[in-house]
């Protein structure tokens, strides 16, 4: 599904920041038809029950623990406080450390003893996934909850000028301030989970920091969420090896390219 909605239809309270998520639901009951047909082997009825939920990518797949994945799928964002420990104390960084510490050290040269960030609880991940960034896409009186937040007041970046790394690469119109088709959300999420926000980021001028000048050292700021020593692997360019770029996509709504056609013989 792709919807194009005027901003004025979404900005009811005037602060310009929205949060969104999608859900899928199925009827509560399935009854086997004693005289089934190919088209209808069963009957469905009862209230619709939420089966899945999605906003930011990979949250349920990689952040929420196995015992609570079904609970997350059935929950509303107002219930996310019960699942916050998966964000504040995630297991994914430890898994990535086990899998990739030796390759990182042998490829990049450093002798990192542990790739996993040590700043527990992870305030940087609470900001990235549950509240949004102050001054960018965090609304007033925000309640920590997992949703895709967007500051509609940030001008859209022209397609040819977009950075696939979004906010962390000085493109405030990109992920996690919303999500564009050309944002490399997997690479961004990997780097944030491994502590990229503990290191200085070139956002001083973009966020209006006094004295910050674009393309100078003054543009590098610490967001105050954690410190570089908390994340030895925070500058490692983690990637899934599947790059994407807005220039590969259409420049008109809905922007996504047509799917590759399947075999005509199937």
Pin down the residues of each PLM region.
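Surface-exposed extracytoplasmic segments
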Residues: 1-266
């Amino acid at each position: 599904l792709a919807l194009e909605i005027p901003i004025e239809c979404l900005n009811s309270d005037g602060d310009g920041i929205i949060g969104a998520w999608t859900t899928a639901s199925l009827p509560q009951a399935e009854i086997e038809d004693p005289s089934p047909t190919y088209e209808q082997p069963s009957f469905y009825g009862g209230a619709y029950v939420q089966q899945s939920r999605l906003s930011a990518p990979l949250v349920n797949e990689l952040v929420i623990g196995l015992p609570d994945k079904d609970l997350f799928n059935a929950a509303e964002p107002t219930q996310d406080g019960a699942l916050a420990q998966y964000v504040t104390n995630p297991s994914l960084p430890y898994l990535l450390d086990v899998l990739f510490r030796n390759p990182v050290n042998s490829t990049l040269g450093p002798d990192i003893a542990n790739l996993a960030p040590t700043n527990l609880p992870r305030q940087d991940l609470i900001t990235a996934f549950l509240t949004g960034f102050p001054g960018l896409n965090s609304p007033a009186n925000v309640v920590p909850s997992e949703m895709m937040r967007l500051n509609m007041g940030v001008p859209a970046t022209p397609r040819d000028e977009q950075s696939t790394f979004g906010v962390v690469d000085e493109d405030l119109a990109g992920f996690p301030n919303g999500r564009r088709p050309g944002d490399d959300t997997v690479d961004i999420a990997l780097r944030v989970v491994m502590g990229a926000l503990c290191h200085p980021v070139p956002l001083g001028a973009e966020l209006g920091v006094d004295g910050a000048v674009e393309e100078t050292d003054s543009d590098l700021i610490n967001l105050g969420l954690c410190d570089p020593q908390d994340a030895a692997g925070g500058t490692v360019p983690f990637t899934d090896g599947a790059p994407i770029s807005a220039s590969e996509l259409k420049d008109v709504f809905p922007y996504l390219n047509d799917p590759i056609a399947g075999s005509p013989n199937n």
